[in-house]
UniProtKB/Swiss-Prot annotation:
The lineage of its organism: Bacteria, Pseudomonadati, Pseudomonadota, Betaproteobacteria, Burkholderiales. Pfam families: OMPdecase (PF00215). It comes from Ralstonia nicotianae (strain ATCC BAA-1114 / GMI1000) (Ralstonia solanacearum). One of its GO terms (biological process) is 'de novo' UMP biosynthetic process. Keywords: Decarboxylase, Lyase, Pyrimidine biosynthesis. It comes from the Bacteria. It catalyses: orotidine 5'-phosphate + H(+) = UMP + CO2. Pathway: Pyrimidine metabolism; UMP biosynthesis via de novo pathway; UMP from orotate: step 2/2. Transmembrane segments: none annotated. It is an enzyme of class 4 (lyase). GO terms for molecular function: orotidine-5'-phosphate decarboxylase activity. Belongs to the OMP decarboxylase family. Type 2 subfamily. This is Orotidine 5'-phosphate decarboxylase.
Length: 271
């Protein structure tokens, strides 16, 4: 099944636009897990088990695994999600961007080694740096557009032919790059006006929207700006607010509580 089909099915099946980011910080893992090997996998698996019926996607951030030499645990985690919760897509948050020959290997890393359903990429080096991902027809390619960090404005608001760069990226994704319907865009919840503008440009293209929770993005403004006509079209990501809802042995139950409250708050504004 194609990534976009998986995502649409998950929106409906779980009545959810919530994406849970899996960013396991070793310094914040519960003490009950840190005394044994495989703590990162065990922590993330518990979060997945507690929230799988509440989400439309999971998004592991590769740096949190690679910095701990835990790439094998990332492979194990994605395989576990696919086996235990088939139909919930996994987005590898890698934000890759390099020349085509190198991008071919990054694509193999994401889609063959890790078996992710989608990957985040940077458009800064142009279409030929993204093309190697698009030759995997069932996979999603989610392009950075208007990111949630304040410093994104340094580049994304520079003007070219009277338009800010982030709008040009959205237009290119709509017109020239998305030839096989595999693309989505990253647009931060911290900038709802830009979410609305991107939605106007790209129509029903899926948007990955980080920035609610700890980063302070407003859920109501985000949903109203980014929803499509049928009340979907978004993967609204929350990571730290869910993962670290408790530092004790009840961390998974606490994560479920925050995830359910977030999912339900999002749903208030979908229609």
């Amino acid at each position: 099944m194609r990534f976009t089909e998986q995502l649409a099915a998950a929106w409906q099946r779980n009545n959810s636009l919530l994406c849970v980011g899996l960013d396991p910080d070793p310094a914040r893992l519960p003490a009950s897990l840190t005394t044994s090997g495989g703590a990162i996998f065990s922590f993330c698996r518990a979060i997945v088990d507690a929230t799988a019926d509440l989400v439309c996607a999971f998004k592991p951030q590769i740096a949190y695994f690679a910095s701990q030499r835990a790439e094998d645990q990332l492979e194990q985690l994605i395989a576990y999600i696919h086996e235990a919760y088939p139909g919930i897509p996994v987005i590898l948050d890698a934000k890759r961007g390099d020349i085509g020959s190198t991008a071919e290997h990054y694509a193999k890393e994401a889609f063959e080694r890790y078996q992710a359903d989608a990957v985040t990429v940077s458009p800064y080096m142009g279409f030929d740096s993204m093309q190697p991902y698009l030759v995997h027809p069932d996979k999603g390619v989610i392009v950075l557009c208007r990111t949630s960090n304040a410093g994104g404005s340094d580049v994304q608001f520079l003007e070219t032919n009277g338009r800010p760069v982030y709008q040009v990226v959205a237009e290119r994704a709509r017109d020239a790059w998305n030839t096989s319907g595999q693309m989505g865009l990253v647009v931060g919840a911290t900038f709802p006006q830009e979410i609305r503008r991107v939605r106007e440009i790209v129509g029903d293209m899926p948007l990955l929207i980080p920035g609610i929770g700890v980063q302070g993005g407003d859920i109501e403004a985000t949903v109203r700006a980014g929803r499509t006509a049928d009340g979907t079209g978004m993967m609204i990501n929350s990571s730290r607010a869910i993962l670290y809802a408790s530092s004790d042995s009840d961390f998974a139950d606490a994560a479920r509580g925050v995830a359910q409250a977030t999912r339900d708050q999002i749903n208030q504004y979908r229609n």
